[in-house]
């Protein structure tokens, strides 16, 4: 297997996860900002690696597999850390909802690919809006410099949770005939 720059960026994103967790637990006043910046850097490389792979025509099967996995693991870890920090149901509930949705839709996409219908559950615009709201929420809730930023983060988290449900139902609806077929 030959590694290209987009794939190396994705691997780097995976390698950032332990440092991201470590930054979250550092006992310094600047640690939340460092943690949030690592998260944003990972989000930017998520966009950038896909852009470069398409632009340079360097898409690979390994990259196509690893990119969404790296994204989902980073987001799931961030959601767990945020839920752990706030230690309350009103943060844990949307976080758990988003993690569950990612597992359900990943399984659905894998199954649809297996039956040759992967394109019917391709990423939609609502999924992209959900991801944007999720990234904004997580950045704000990881950084949390002031109450107003936390409030914006919580609002964005709930917007992301609603969009999470909406997009999940869209994907399940698109696959319903195949799911319900005997």
From Swiss-Prot:
Pathway annotation from the record: Phospholipid metabolism; phosphatidylglycerol biosynthesis; phosphatidylglycerol from CDP-diacylglycerol: step 1/2
Positions on the Cytoplasmic side per record topology: 2-12, 82-86, 169-181
Main subcellular location of this protein, as a coarse class: membrane
InterPro entries for the chain: CDP-alcohol_PTase-I (IPR050324), CDP-OH_P_trans (IPR000462), CDP-OH_PTrfase_TM_dom (IPR043130), CDP_ALCOHOL_P_TRANSF_CS (IPR048254), PGP_synthase_bac (IPR023762), Phosphatidylglycerol_P_synth (IPR004570)
Pfam families registered for this protein in UniProt: CDP-OH_P_transf
This protein's GO CC annotations: plasma membrane
Keywords: Cell inner membrane, Cell membrane, Lipid biosynthesis, Lipid metabolism, Membrane, Phospholipid biosynthesis, Phospholipid metabolism, Transferase, Transmembrane, Transmembrane helix
Periplasmic domain ranges by topology: 38-60, 108-145
Subcellular location: Cell inner membrane
Membrane topology: Multi-pass membrane protein
GO molecular function, one term: CDP-diacylglycerol-glycerol-3-phosphate 3-phosphatidyltransferase activity
Top-rank taxon: Bacteria
GO BP, one annotated term: phosphatidylglycerol biosynthetic process
Catalytic activity: a CDP-1,2-diacyl-sn-glycerol + sn-glycerol 3-phosphate = a 1,2-diacyl-sn-glycero-3-phospho-(1'-sn-glycero-3'-phosphate) + CMP + H(+)
Main enzyme class: transferase
Protein purpose: Catalyzes the conversion of cytidine diphosphate diacylglycerol (CDP-DG) and glycerol 3-phosphate into phosphatidylglycerol. Essential for the synthesis of anionic phospholipids, thereby playing a role in balancing the ratio of zwitterionic and anionic phospholipids, which is thought to be important for normal membrane function.
Membership in a protein family: Belongs to the CDP-alcohol phosphatidyltransferase class-I family.
Identification of the protein by name: CDP-diacylglycerol--glycerol-3-phosphate 3-phosphatidyltransferase
Species assigned in the record: Pectobacterium atrosepticum (strain SCRI 1043 / ATCC BAA-672)
């Amino acid at each position: 297997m030959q590694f290209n720059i987009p794939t190396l960026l994705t691997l780097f994103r995976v390698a950032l996860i332990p440092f991201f967790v470590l930054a979250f637990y550092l006992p310094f006043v600047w640690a939340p900002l460092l943690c949030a910046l690592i998260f944003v850097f990972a989000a930017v490389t998520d966009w950038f690696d896909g852009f470069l792979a398409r632009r340079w025509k360097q898409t690979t099967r390994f990259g196509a597999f690893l990119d969404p996995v790296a994204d989902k693991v980073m987001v799931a870890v961030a959601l767990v850390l945020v839920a752990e920090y706030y230690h309350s149901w009103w943060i844990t509930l949307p976080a758990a909802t988003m993690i569950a949705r990612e597992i359900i839709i990943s399984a659905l996409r894998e199954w649809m690919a297996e039956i040759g219908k992967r394109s019917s559950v391709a990423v939609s615009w609502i999924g992209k809006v959900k991801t944007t709201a999720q990234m904004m929420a997580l950045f704000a809730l990881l950084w949390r410099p002031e109450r107003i930023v936390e409030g914006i983060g919580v609002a964005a988290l709930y917007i992301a949770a609603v969009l999470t449900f909406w997009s999940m139902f869209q994907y399940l609806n698109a696959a319903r005939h195949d799911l319900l077929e005997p």
